[in-house]
Amino acid sequence: MMCGAPSATMPATTETQEIADKVKSQLEEKANQKFDVFKAISFRRQVVAGTNFFIKVDVGEEKCVHLRVFEPLPHENKPLTLSSYQTDKEKHDELTYF
């Protein structure tokens, strides 16, 4: 993967679900909404000064949210941050940079 360029979309892994779970409360607060279903479906990764994860999450009722989560470099010892999100997405919507 080239630094700065997002990877191809890949199926979600256990690590992807863990990342999504760690920012779920941030999303619920920002979106003013609770999600009973929260299952990562796919993701893209972008290496910058840290890593951006673009994650498509199934939130039930045929709807998805797209998350952009920033993971700082390990030596910075900082938590994951929900940088941005898109609601009212569907499973067929492409996961792109936002």
From Swiss-Prot:
Q: What GO molecular function annotation could you give as one example from this UniProt entry?
A: cysteine-type endopeptidase inhibitor activity
Mostly located where? cytoplasm
The residue numbers the entry assigns to motif Secondary area of contact are 46-50
| Record SUPFAM superfamilies | Cystatin/monellin (SSF54403)
**PROSITE patterns of this UniProt entry?**
CYSTATIN
Show the GO cellular component annotation of the record.
cytoplasm; cytosol; extracellular space; nucleolus; nucleus
Disulfide bridge partners, by residue number:
none
Gene Ontology biological process terms in this record: adult locomotory behavior; amyloid fibril formation; negative regulation of proteolysis
What SMART domains does the annotation carry?
A: CY
Q: Does the keyword Cytoplasm apply?
A: yes
Q: Where is this site: Reactive site?
A: G4
Recite the UniProt keywords alphabetically.
Acetylation, Cytoplasm, Protease inhibitor, Thiol protease inhibitor
- Organism superkingdom: Eukaryota
Q: What does this protein do?
A: This is an intracellular thiol proteinase inhibitor.
Family to which the UniProt record says this protein belongs: Belongs to the cystatin family.
- Can you say what this protein is called? Cystatin-B
* Protein species of origin: Rattus norvegicus
